[in-house]
């Protein structure tokens, strides 16, 4: 376990996270899903809302992958599991606080778009895609360090 191990254990004791076995197979499937969603987000013939949803889903999957790398998943038996995954990025992947706040604002925007029908602006879409790409690069670097990616594995 890495950088925020004690914090993550405390989150598990509070019922916000569940301890799970680290699984390279699951992690690589999650990475593939995130890459696919990010590629879908780049399809300009889709609406901004669809593209935003794809980019946000990539962020969420990558945040979940960060938890997996540390032997946890967000507890789905409680509300707020997306928020828990994002807010733990500091402890799972070393994401700085200001970026976590941006990602949380994108989560809130996703809820407004998904539940209230708010339209997604080109600016918000671009920010979501930029954040998804940056998080993907961070995850890929971590997976290379863990030996999950490398020659013939990418």
Regions found by a protein language model. Give the residues of each.
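Terminal alpha-helical segments
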Residues: 1-154
